[in-house]
Amino acid sequence: SRREIDLRWPLIAFLLAASLASVLGLINHFGVDLFGFYQNLRAADLGRFLSTLGNADFYGSYLVLAFPVALNAIIHADGRRSFMLSAAAMVCVFFGALVAGSDSAALGLLATAVVFPLVLFNDASAMRRLALGWGVFFLTAFVFGLLSAVLPSKTYLSFFTVAVSRAVVSLPLAATAVALWFLLGRAG
């Protein structure tokens, strides 16, 4: 007999790992070294080391994989609990992606922005949640910009992160995404 494979548990495990790596990357960016990883690093490596993954490029590549998975989890969440847990994982991964300091991570995020609408175009509910997800991303970028103004930065940031975390960029983009979310709700 054929069994259908339940991929929820691997998805949950991946999102949990990505969320933890992202939160650790975020607090590392602001100068908190929970596990003493920075003690034996050379001065030249201090600005490029993030989370348990080490190199910022590897960390950024990992989060480029986690970013669409987190968006997909919230798009397909069924029930309030699943939606809230997916949203929490998504916000963690968004913060982690912002501190990656890798231009390749930024390109991966832009690829997600292009590919997801093409795949989801025929599903109005999924498109609506995608718009909400991008709205949350830009609000996360805005909050990151606020935090960056008052907390010390210990790692490098990509040009993309510096630009998108400015209020003049993040707030209009968040408002546009939320407006699209409302419009898609009225159309559906």
Predicted regions and their residues:
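Alpha-helical transmembrane segments of multi-pass inner-membrane proteins
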Residues: 1, 5-188
